[in-house]
C-alpha cells in the first residue's frame, strides 16, 4: 500500500471522471470534501470510485493461523477500487478491513458513506438485471486506443494514453512497461510524429492532378470494393479534378462511408490533407472503425467530448510541435461540435470536407448551415440517401451550399413551368449528383424485403379518449385559424400510439399482472404487437421496433420487462459511446438480445443492425425518409435473411390520413412540385379523417361490423416469409414512382366477412368525408360535435365538485396553456410551415453532447410500480428538486395552476376555470391545492430578522418552496379579475349607463377611436372575463365578440387580416386597450373605497384629493440637510439627497402602487366566506388605510409601514 501511495503522489495529468457504466444510473457519489486531517498516510483517500465487491482469498493477519509459519489464506470481502490519477490498469482489491480502519482513523473521508451507497446501488442493479449483467471494468478501458504524447519520467519514457471507449479527458500518463503489450500503438505514435512524415505533407493549394480512373480496387485500401463502389470512387475523383462539389446520394445501405474513405485515402496518396468529416453522433464511431478497416495508415482523430476533452485534443493531436502543420490526416467530428469548435476548426484550410447525412443542411437559417459555411475547403462532398426530402427549397439549400454561384437564386428557377422545371433541374444536377438504388446494384447480394401496412382497430379505451380529445377541442376545430390545431393533432397521434402517453392518464396499479393486462387492453397496436412478438421469438427472429415518442419506449420497456425478454434501447438521450456499446452488444455473435427499441430519429441514421431481420414501425414519422432510414438499418449489405417490415396504423384515424400525405413527399424525388408545407386546412383534413364514422359507432353496431380480427392463422400468414421474393419483384418496377406501391396493405379476415365491394364503398365514404374543404369546415365540426360539446359542458358544470376523474374515465383536453404569456399571445402561430412534434423527433444537432450526457440515462428497470391507493392521504410534500410533489401536484401541474390563476384569478373560488387545464386532477384535488395556494400567497411574515427574511424569501411557513412566486402580484391579479366580473355584472344590470365616467376616460385616454366606440368596450370587458387576461388572440378570433373587424378599421388593415404581422398588430391593439381599461377599473374601485372610508371616518373627500395628498411628499430642505451634516458624517447627507431624488422621481410610481393595492382590502372578504382565515391574511397584507404611510425602501420597493 505504501508503494502505491508514492506512485499516486507523483502522478500528474488530467483527473478523470467517474466511469460510465450502468451502475452510474443508480449512484452519483458526492465529491469528498475534506474537513481536516491529512490523506498522506491513508491511500484510501485517493480512491476515485469503488467498482466492484467480491469475497476473495487473502493472507491471514493471524500469526498463529499456520503451524509452519506460512500465512493461511482466508476468504474476506474486498472492494475493487479505481485510484485518482491512475488508469484502470492500476485498479486494486482492498479488503473491507482496511476500510473499517479508515472509518475510525479518517472519518473526514466519509468512506463509510461511499461504501454504503455502493453496496445499496449494487444490490439494486443485481436485483433488476442479474449479476451476469454487471461488468466492473470493460476490457476496452484497459486497451490502448491512441498514444498522444510522450515525456521523460523518473524511470524512463512515459506516454499519455487514451483508452478505448473513454474520453480524451480520461487520458493518463503510463510508463512504457505499463503498456508493453501495445507495441503497435507505441510504434504508430512514433511514426506519426516522425520528421519524415512531417516533411511528406505538401500544401494543398497546389494544382489538382488530371483524373485517373481506377479499374480495380487501389492497393492502398485493405479491402475490396464492389463494382458500383469503385464507380463511386471514380465519380468522386473525377469531380475533384473538375473542381465540382458533389452529392453522393446512393440509397441507404450501399456503403457511402466506404466510398468516401477510399476517396480520402486516394488524396492522401498524393500527400493532400487535412480532411474534415462531419457525421451524426450515432455514426461517428462507425466512421472511425471503417477508417481503421480500410485505411489504417491514415491518422484519424475524433474531435468530440466536452471542452476539457477538446482542449486535450487540440493540444496534442492538432499540430506538430514545430510549426503549424496539421498532425492528423482526417478529423472526425459531429454536428454538435461544429459550432462550439468553430474558432478552432474554421481557420484550418481543409482539402476536402465530407458531410454525412448532408440533408441536415436543408435549412439555410440553421446554426449548422451557418457554421459550416464559414469553413474553407477546396472540395465538398455531401452524403445522403435522401437528397429530396420535403420541397424544392430544401434541395436548393443543399445545392447552394455546394455551389453558391451556380445555384444562387431559387426564384429564377421557380418561374419556369413544371415540365421545364423538372428537365432543367435534372440538367443542373447531373454533374453534382450520383444516386444508385439497391435494386439496381445488389440484386443478388442483398436478400429481398417485404413491407406490410397492418391496419389495426383502436381499443375501446382508445376510441373513448380519441373522441374526448376531439370533443374537448371543439372551439379550436371550429375557428377559421388556430395554431393550436397542431396540438390537437399531436394528442391524437399520442392516443394512437398508446393512451398512456397523455399526461397522468396511466392508471395506478400495485399488482404487476393487472398492470400488464391493462397496458395491453388499452392499445390495439400493443395487442397485435404482443401476438406477433411471441411468434417471432419462437421462430428465432430478431426485431427492431421504431417509434416517435420516448414515452412509448418506456411502455415497450415495461412490456419486455414483464415478458422477461432481453433487449437494447437507443434514444436521443443516450451518449455516443454508450450507443456503440449497445449496438455492439446487440450485434455480437450469439447475442441474447431479442429486440432493439429505437427512436426513429436517434436510431435510424447510419448504424448497422443487419443481425436483425424484422422491423416494426410502431408509429410513422412525418418524414417518410426517416422511416426508410430506419428500415435500411436491417436491409443492407451484410444481411443474410429475408427482411420483413411491418408498419402499424390505426384504422380510420389521423395515422391513416398521414400515410396519404407522405405519399406526396416521396413523389417529390421524381416530380418536383414546390412547397409541401402543411397548411391549416391539411391539418384539419387529417383530424377529420374517420371522425364521423368513429362517432357513429356510439349507438349502433356499425363499429363492430368492420372490425379487423388478427387470429393465430392471420398472424402466421403475416409472419410467413416464403413469398417475399415474389412480392419484391412485383414492386421493383414501380417503387420509385409511387410511394405507396412500396407497401402491401394487410387487411385480414373481417369478423363479419364483409365482401370486398362493401369494404371499398366504406373506404370511399371515409375518403369523401375527409375531403370536406374549408368552406364546410366549421359546419362539419358543428354538425358532429356541437350537441355533444354542449352536453358535456352542462354535465361538467352540474357535476362539479362531485365527479371523480381518473385514468379509466373520459379525459378532458388541456386548455392549451403552452406558452401562456401574461400580456400577449404573440406566440400563437397562424401559419404552419411544418408540424413541430414534441417527441423524440427532435434533431440531435440541436442538443450539445455535453448537455445530453448530463441527463440521466435510461436503464433496464422492473415493471414500474403505480402510485398510492386513492384512499391514502396525499402528503403535503414528497420528493425533491424537479420531482417535488405538493399535495400530489408535480412541477408541470403547479405551473399550469399558476398560469391559469394569472389568467382567471380565483374566479368565484369554485375553481371552474381550472378543471379543463388540470384534467388529470379530480375536482377535490384541485380544490385542496387551491386553498393551499391562497394560504401561501396570503402569508404575512412578522419576523423581520435577517435569517428569517432569507428563509421566507425561499419557502412558505409550512416549508413549501416559493418557486419564484410573487404573492403581491398574484393578489393584485386575482382582485382585478374580480373587478372585471363585477364590471360585467354592472354593465348587464345597467345597459344604458356609460362604461366609464368622463373624468376616467380623459385620465386614461379611453376616447373613441375612428371606428371603435364605447359599445365595443362594453363587449371587450366580458371578453376578458371569458377568455382570461392576456388571451388577446382568443379574444380577437372570437366570432361571437366580433371585435376583429372594428379593430381592422381602426388600424386601417384589410378584413380579414391576411398576414401574420397584421394579426399581431390587432392583438397588440387589443392588449393596449385592455391595459388602459385595467387602470381605469382599478381607479374607479379605489375611488369608491376611499369615498366609503371618508364617509365612515369623515376623513378625506375624494380619491382625486387623495391623489393630490399623495404627491405632497416634501423633500428635505437645505437647512435640514445642513443640520444632518453637523456631525460631519457624509453618509447622512447622501441619504438625505437620495431621499430628495426619490421624492421627485418616485412619487407618481408610489401613487400607482397605492392604486394597485389599496382597494384589495375588502374584495376577497366579500367574495368567499368559507376562506375567512385566509381572507383575513389577504386583507391584512393588502390593506393601506388612512393610518398607513407609503414609503420607498432602500431598494426602491414600495413597503407598508404600520
Swiss-Prot record:
* UniProt region (Disordered), positions on chain: 838-872
Give the residue ranges of motif DEAH box: 356-359
List ligand-binding residues for ATP. Answer: 250-257
Its Gene Ontology cellular component terms are: nucleus
Q: Pinpoint the Chromo domain residues.
A: 45-109, 142-201
Pfam family for this entry, one: Chromo
Quick check: keyword Nucleus in the entry?
Answer: yes
Q: Which InterPro entries match?
A: CHD_II_SANT-like, Chromo-like_dom_sf, Chromo/chromo_shadow_dom, Chromo_domain, DUF1087, Helicase_ATP-bd, Helicase_C-like, P-loop_NTPase
Q: Has UniProt tagged this entry with the keyword Cytoplasm?
A: no
Q: Which residues form the Helicase ATP-binding domain?
A: 237-405
Question: What is the enzyme's class at the highest EC level?
Answer: hydrolase
- What EC number(s) would the UniProt record show? 3.6.4.-
Example GO biological process term?
chromatin remodeling
Gene3D superfamilies in the record, alphabetically? 2.40.50.40, Homeodomain-like, P-loop containing nucleotide triphosphate hydrolases, Tandem AAA-ATPase domain
Listed GO MF terms: ATP binding; DNA binding; helicase activity; hydrolase activity
Domain named Helicase C-terminal is located at 528-679
Keywords carried by this UniProt record: ATP-binding, Chromatin regulator, DNA-binding, Helicase, Hydrolase, Nucleotide-binding, Nucleus, Repeat
Which residues fall in a compositionally biased region of kind Basic residues?
853-867
**Location relative to the cell:** Nucleus
Give a short account of what the protein does.
Chromatin remodeling factor that represses the expression of embryonic trait genes upon and after seed germination and thus enables the developmental switch to post-germinative growth.
What family does the database annotate? Answer: Belongs to the SNF2/RAD54 helicase family.
Identification of the protein by name: CHD3-type chromatin-remodeling factor CHR7
Lineage here is: Eukaryota, Viridiplantae, Streptophyta, Embryophyta, Tracheophyta
Amino acid at each position: 500500500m505504501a508503494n502505491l501511495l508514492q506512485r499516486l503522489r507523483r502522478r500528474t495529468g488530467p483527473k478523470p471522471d467517474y466511469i460510465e457504466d450502468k451502475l452510474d444510473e443508480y449512484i452519483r457519489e458526492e465529491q469528498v470534501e475534506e474537513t481536516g486531517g491529512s490523506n498522506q498516510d491513508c491511500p484510501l483517500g485517493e480512491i476515485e470510485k469503488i467498482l466492484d465487491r467480491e469475497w476473495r482469498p487473502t493472507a491471514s493477519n493471524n500469526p498463529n493461523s499456520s503451524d509452519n509459519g506460512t500465512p493461511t489464506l482466508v476468504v474476506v470481502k474486498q472492494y475493487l477500487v479505481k485510484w485518482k490519477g491512475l488508469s484502470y490498469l492500476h485498479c486494486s482489491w482492498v479488503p473491507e478491513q482496511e476500510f473499517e480502519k479508515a472509518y475510525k482513523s479518517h472519518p473526514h473521508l466519509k468512506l463509510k458513506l461511499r461504501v454504503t451507497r455502493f453496496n445499496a446501488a449494487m444490490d439494486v442493479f443485481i436485483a433488476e438485471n442479474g449479476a451476469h449483467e454487471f461488468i466492473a471494468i470493460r476490457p476496452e478501458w484497459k486497451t490502448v486506443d491512441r498514444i498522444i504524447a510522450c515525456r521523460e519520467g523518473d524511470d524512463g519514457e512515459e506516454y499519455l494514453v487514451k483508452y478505448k471507449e473513454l474520453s480524451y479527458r480520461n487520458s493518463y500518463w503510463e510508463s512504457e512497461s505499463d503498456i508493453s503489450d501495445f507495441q503497435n500503438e507505441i510504434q504508430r505514435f512514433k511514426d506519426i510524429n516522425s520528421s519524415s512524415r512531417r516533411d511528406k505533407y505538401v500544401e494543398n493549394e497546389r494544382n489538382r492532378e488530371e483524373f485517373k480512373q481506377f479499374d480495380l480496387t487501389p492497393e492502398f485500401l485493405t479491402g475490396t470494393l464492389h463494382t458500383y463502389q469503385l464507380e463511386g470512387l471514380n465519380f468522386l475523383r473525377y469531380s475533384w479534378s473538375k473542381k465540382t462539389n458533389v452529392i453522393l446520394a446512393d440509397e441507404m445501405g450501399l456503403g457511402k462511408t466506404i466510398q468516401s474513405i477510399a476517396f480520402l485515402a486516394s488524396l492522401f496518396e498524393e500527400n493532400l490533407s487535412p480532411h474534415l468529416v462531419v457525421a451524426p453522433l450515432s455514426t461517428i464511431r462507425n466512421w472511425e472503425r471503417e477508417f481503421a478497416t480500410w485505411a489504417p495508415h491514415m491518422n484519424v482523430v475524433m474531435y468530440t467530448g466536452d471542452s476539457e476533452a477538446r482542449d486535450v485534443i487540440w493540444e496534442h493531436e492538432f499540430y506538430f510541435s514545430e510549426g503549424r502543420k496539421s498532425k492528423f490526416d482526417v478529423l472526425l467530428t459531429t454536428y454538435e461540435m461544429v459550432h462550439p469548435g468553430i474558432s478552432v476548426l474554421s481557420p484550418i484550410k481543409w482539402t476536402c470536407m465530407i458531410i454525412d447525412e448532408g440533408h441536415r443542411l436543408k435549412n439555410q437559417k440553421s446554426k449548422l448551415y451557418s457554421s459550416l459555411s464559414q469553413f474553407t475547403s477546396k472540395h465538398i462532398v455531401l452524403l445522403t440517401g435522401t437528397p429530396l426530402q420535403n420541397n424544392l427549397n430544401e434541395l436548393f439549400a443543399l445545392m447552394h451550399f455546394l455551389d453558391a454561384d451556380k445555384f444562387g437564386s431559387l426564384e429564377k428557377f421557380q418561374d419556369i413551368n413544371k415540365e421545364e422545371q423538372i428537365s432543367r433541374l435534372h440538367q443542373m444536377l447531373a454533374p453534382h449528383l450520383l444516386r444508385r438504388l439497391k435494386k439496381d446494384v445488389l440484386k443478388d447480394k442483398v436478400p429481398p424485403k417485404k413491407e406490410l401496412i397492418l391496419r389495426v382497430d383502436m381499443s375501446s379505451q382508445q376510441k373513448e379518449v380519441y373522441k374526448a380529445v376531439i370533443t374537448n377541442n371543439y372551439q379550436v376545430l371550429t375557428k377559421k385559424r388556430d395554431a393550436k390545431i397542431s396540438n390537437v393533432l399531436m394528442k391524437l397521434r399520442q392516443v394512437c400510439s398508446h393512451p398512456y402517453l397523455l399526461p397522468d392518464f396511466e392508471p395506478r396499479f400495485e399488482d404487476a399482472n393487472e398492470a400488464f393486462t391493462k397496458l395491453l387492453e388499452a392499445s390495439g397496436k400493443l395487442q397485435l404487437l404482443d401476438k406477433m412478438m411471441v411468434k417471432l421469438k419462437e421462430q428465432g427472429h430478431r426485431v427492431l421496433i421504431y417509434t416517435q415518442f420516448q414515452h412509448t419506449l418506456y411502455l415497450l420497456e415495461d412490456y419486455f420487462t414483464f415478458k422477461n425478454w432481453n433487449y437494447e434501447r437507443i434514444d436521443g438521450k443516450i451518449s455516443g459511446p454508450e450507443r456503440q456499446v449497445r449496438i455492439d452488444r446487440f450485434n455480437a455473435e450469439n447475442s441474447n438480445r431479442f429486440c432493439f427499441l429505437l427512436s426513429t430519429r436517434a436510431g435510424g441514421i447510419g448504424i448497422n443492425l443487419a443481425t436483425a431481420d424484422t422491423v416494426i414501425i410502431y408509429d410513422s414519422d412525418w418524414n417518410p425518409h426517416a422511416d426508410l432510414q430506419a428500415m435500411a438499418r436491417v436491409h443492407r449489405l451484410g444481411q443474410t435473411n429475408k427482411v420483413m417490415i411491418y408498419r402499424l396504423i390505426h384504422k380510420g384515424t389521423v395515422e391513416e390520413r398521414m400515410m396519404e400525405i407522405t405519399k406526396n413527399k416521396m413523389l417529390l424525388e421524381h416530380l418536383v412540385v414546390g412547397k409541401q408545407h402543411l397548411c391549416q386546412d391539411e391539418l384539419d383534413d387529417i383530424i377529420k379523417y374517420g371522425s364521423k364514422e368513429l362517432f357513429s359507432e356510439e349507438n349502433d353496431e356499425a363499429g363492430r361490423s368492420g372490425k379487423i380480427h388478427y387470429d393465430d392463422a392471420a398472424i402466421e400468414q403475416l409472419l410467413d416469409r416464403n413469398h417475399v421474393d415474389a412480392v419484391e419483384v412485383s414492386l421493383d418496377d414501380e417503387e420509385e414512382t409511387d410511394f405507396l406501391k412500396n407497401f402491401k396493405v394487410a387487411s385480414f379476415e373481417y369478423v363479419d366477412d364483409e365482401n370486398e365491394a362493401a369494404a371499398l364503398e366504406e373506404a370511399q365514404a371515409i375518403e369523401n368525408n375527409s375531403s370536406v374543404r374549408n368552406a364546410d369546415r366549421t359546419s362539419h365540426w358543428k354538425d358532429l360535435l356541437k350537441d355533444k360539446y354542449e352536453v358535456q359542458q352542462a354535465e361538467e358544470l352540474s357535476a362539479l365538485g362531485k365527479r371523480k376523474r381518473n385514468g379509466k374515465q373520459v379525459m378532458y383536453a388541456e386548455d392549451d396553456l403552452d406558452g401562456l404569456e401574461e400580456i400577449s399571445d404573440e406566440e400563437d402561430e397562424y401559419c404552419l410551415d411544418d408540424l413541430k412534434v414534441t417527441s423524440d423527433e427532435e434533431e440531435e444537432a440541436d442538443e450539445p453532447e455535453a448537455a445530453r450526457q448530463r441527463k440521466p440515462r435510461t436503464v433496464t428497470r422492473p415493471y414500474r410500480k403505480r402510485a398510492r391507493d386513492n384512499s391514502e392521504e396525499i402528503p403535503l410534500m414528497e420528493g425533491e428538486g424537479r420531482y417535488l410533489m405538493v399535495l400530489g401536484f408535480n412541477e408541470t401541474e403547479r405551473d399550469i395552476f399558476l398560469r391559469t390563476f394569472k389568467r382567471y384569478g380565483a374566479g368565484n373560488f369554485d375553481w371552474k376555470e381550472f378543471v379543463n387545464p388540470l384534467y388529470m386532477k379530480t375536482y377535490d384535488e384541485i380544490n385542496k391545492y387551491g386553498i393551499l395556494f391562497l394560504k401561501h400567497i396570503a402569508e404575512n411574515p412578522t419576523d423581520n430578522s435577517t435569517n428569517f427574511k432569507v428563509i421566507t424569501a425561499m419557502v412558505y411557513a409550512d416549508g413549501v418552496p416559493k418557486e419564484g412566486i410573487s404573492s403581491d402580484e398574484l393578489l393584485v391579479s386575482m382582485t382585478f379579475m374580480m373587478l372585471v366580473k363585477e364590471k360585467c355584472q354592472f354593465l348587464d344590470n345597467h345597459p344604458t349607463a356609460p362604461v366609464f365616467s368622463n373624468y376616467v376616460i380623459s385620465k386614461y385616454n379611453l376616447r373613441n377611436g375612428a371606428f371603435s366606440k364605447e359599445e365595443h368596450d362594453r363587449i371587450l370587458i366580458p371578453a376578458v372575463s371569458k377568455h382570461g387576461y392576456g388571451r388577446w388572440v382568443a379574444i380577437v378570433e372570437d366570432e361571437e365578440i366580433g371585435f376583429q373587424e372594428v379593430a381592422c378599421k381602426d388600424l386601417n388593415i384589410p378584413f380579414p387580416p391576411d398576414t401574420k404581422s397584421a394579426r399581431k398588430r390587432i392583438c397588440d391593439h387589443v392588449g393596449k386597450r385592455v391595459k388602459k381599461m385595467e387602470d381605469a377599473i382599478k381607479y374607479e374601485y379605489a375611488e369608491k373605497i376611499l369615498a366609503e372610508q371618508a364617509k365612515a371616518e369623515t376623513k378625506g373627500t375624494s380619491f382625486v384629493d387623495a391623489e393630490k395628498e399623495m404627491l405632497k411628499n416634501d423633500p428635505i430642505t437645505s437647512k435640514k440637510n445642513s443640520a444632518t451634516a453637523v456631525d460631519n458624517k457624509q453618509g447622512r447627507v447622501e441619504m438625505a439627497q437620495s431621499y430628495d431624488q426619490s421624492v421627485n422621481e418616485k412619487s407618481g410610481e408610489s401613487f400607482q402602487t397605492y392604486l394597485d393595492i389599496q382597494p384589495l382590502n375588502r374584495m376577497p372578504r366579500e367574495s368567499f366566506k368559507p376562506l375567512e382565515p385566509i381572507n383575513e391574511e389577504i386583507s391584512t397584507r393588502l390593506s393601506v388605510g388612512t393610518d398607513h404611510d407609503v414609503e420607498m425602501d432602500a431598494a426602491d420597493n414600495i413597503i407598508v409601514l404600520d
